Amino acid sequence: VQPRVVFVEPAAMTAWSNVDRSSLTELRAVIATEGHDIAGAITLTESLMHAPVPILNMSPTEVAVFIFTSGTAGSPKAAMLTHNNLHSNLVQISQENVLRNSDVVYGVLPLFHIFGLNVVLGYTLFVGATVVLVQRFDPSTALETFAERGVTVVPGAPQVWSALAQMPDDECKVLSQLR
């Protein structure tokens, strides 16, 4: 499997600089998520200004992503999920009507886990809602983001809610806008 596009965030720039790109024969673009510090890369904003890429007619049984398991029963393994696997999961989730297209979802869960990728990002886009992606959780910054961006839904691990519960009451008024 060869990547065609690679997204590189600031925290991964050192790792990316050590990759032997001569072996990436299918690579067509490197997109820097912030700044323009990577030779030959374009910014995420620049990538969105290009003409739309034609939609490919993919087989539902083709592998769409490799998601690594947590490794609780040994070493992490690459689970191959097809386009149909991902789409079926989105359809199943949408039957619960959890999100509305007017929602703004706080996306702090990692996208290299299936919940972050397909529930937080995928389902949000599937219903036409907005997702605010952040790299790291900080309770003070999160509360500011909730207020500034009008966040209405926060999928999060127990540690997120525990940290928010420790914040002073006067800073937590914005939590009343969450559903």
Predicted segment positions?
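Short beta-strand->loop structural element characteristic of the AMP-binding/adenylate-forming
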Residues: 1-15, 77-80, 107, 129-136
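Structural core segment of the AMP-binding/adenylate-forming
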Residues: 1-46, 176
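Conserved S/T- and glycine-rich ATP-binding loop of Class I adenylate-forming
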Residues: 6, 63, 69-72, 105, ...
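Adenylate-forming
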Residues: 8-18, 137-138, 151-179
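Conserved pre-ATP/AMP-binding loop-to-beta segment of ANL
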Residues: 50-68, 75, 98-104
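Short hydrophobic/charged patches on amphipathic alpha-helices used for structural packing
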Residues: 55, 67, 140-143, 170-172
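Conserved AMP-binding A3 loop
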Residues: 64-88
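Conserved AMP-binding/adenylation subdomain of ANL enzymes
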Residues: 87-104, 114-153, 162-163, 167-168
